[in-house]
Amino acid sequence: MHARCTQFLVLVGIMALAACADRPDPARIGAPSFAVGGVGRPTVLVNPKANDNGTAKTIQEGIDMVASGGQVLVTPGTYDEAIVIDKGLALEAIAGESEPVIVAPSGSVNAAIRVATPDAVLIRGLTVHYTGVRGIFGDGAVDVTIERSAVVAVNPPLGGSTLISILHDAPTTGRGHLVVSGSVLDGNLPFEDSPTPPFPQLFGITVAGDVDARLEGNVIRRTGGACVFVRPRLDLGGETNADILGNDLDECYPIGRAGSILVGPAAPLPSPRPPFTATGVVNVVGNTIRNSTHSCLASSAINYESFGGRIERNRVLGVVQPCALASGRVVPAGIWVGSLRGLPAAAPITVRFNDIEGNAQAGLRVASNMTTSIDASCNWWGSASGPSGAGPGSGDAVVVEAGAATPAFLPFALAQIAGTDATSCE
């Protein structure tokens, strides 16, 4: 109960996004002096309580009125509308107000906020409550930045869905771009310990295809899929790059037992299977990943099947339980590297300066296709004696699947290291 209350207070604190100050009456907030009449204005105010004709009464009306590259400022309140952003703009909650701006479309929606433009879109300070497939969604070569916002699922449906997703699966020359920072994502699922009976496969953030992404400083809770999912195009080609930095992940209940952070192709793989030609760099750095409810569904904290990059300075704390089971894409481990599905080895990759502690079965496990030794030095394994398994100590185990090369885990850290600035452990 205490953990739930703390989580609620953190969620409310971030969603408020407001400083303590005297609050103006929203009914008295009118349009800026330059925004009288006409279409295509640089700044548009949204205030359903305003009486003048120059102020938009809905967010969609404000989007339609503003010029490309302009700013839509939204006064506090709950807006029952699904939004389509079809031009570059900044959509922002007005700072300094006492209540949040909540986008809460009634009924079930395909997307509460859909971005349908290649031009840069900024979403700042909004709260999204929705029932349906997606909270915030962009398809194709979109350019979306989401800052200090909150996305909360309400009665999510069975089947696949996601709180925030950018999908670019078409083999074109354009690229998608996504930044999500300082935001709170809540899948709103109760504790799950088994895929039976089925529950919503709700992902936190999905980055797919020809996309460059930066996901930094977010809090993600109570999902039914991976809290973060980065995958290549569905044809197993293209280039996908992502930096997953400094996020706080907990209560990720992947119904497919894949992982809290999942890096690799979607399941099932296409049939007939094309050659895997996807390239990209996916860095997983400075994240804290827990399983505070001790769910058996968390078979890994980081499941790194494809691409190359750095897995560094993460805190992987008590994620894998003794009851965790293998799936078609992972054998239980705090950090899993490689593929059970016949894909090329993830490379080049380093696993360094992590705190890997309290994970049953394995702290690090490498798949059979990882035939070249990876650098796994300077990790803290929960014991000053080092890792167990392939290692000499009693800490979380290093497990090497048949045919794989043993990771280079020496030297190892003698104390927790992820939160330090250490560049060596000798």
Where are these regions (language model features)?
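Right-handed parallel beta-helix/beta-spiral solenoid domain characteristic of secreted/periplasmic
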Residues: 89-135, 148, 155, 181-182, ...
